[in-house]
Amino acid sequence: MHIGQHIKEVMQQQGATATQLAKDICCARTHIHRIFLKDNIDIALLERISTALNHDFFRDLSDEFRAKV
């Protein structure tokens, strides 16, 4: 799973914007766009994004990992 792309997809499905997500996690909008390009992410940052979008990205990653094992 490309986590940055997954975050972007979930955000768009919810009708949220990069600007709103940036406000919710207290960072610059440009940083959000850089996150979308990453295939890995800091756990603390993912926790903040999960809270802001009310989505359990950790479960998504875990489910994908289990499917591979």
Which sequence ranges carry the predicted segments?
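Recognition helix of helix-turn-helix/homeodomain-like DNA-binding domains
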Residues: 26-41
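Alpha-helical residues within the helix-turn-helix
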Residues: 12, 23, 51
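A short, Lys/Arg-rich alpha-helix, primarily the initiator
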Residues: 1-20
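Residues within the helices of the helix-turn-helix
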Residues: 8, 19, 23, 33, ...
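DNA major-groove recognition helix of helix-turn-helix/homeodomain DNA-binding modules
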Residues: 44-60
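Short, charged recognition helix plus adjacent turn
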Residues: 9, 14-15, 34, 59-69
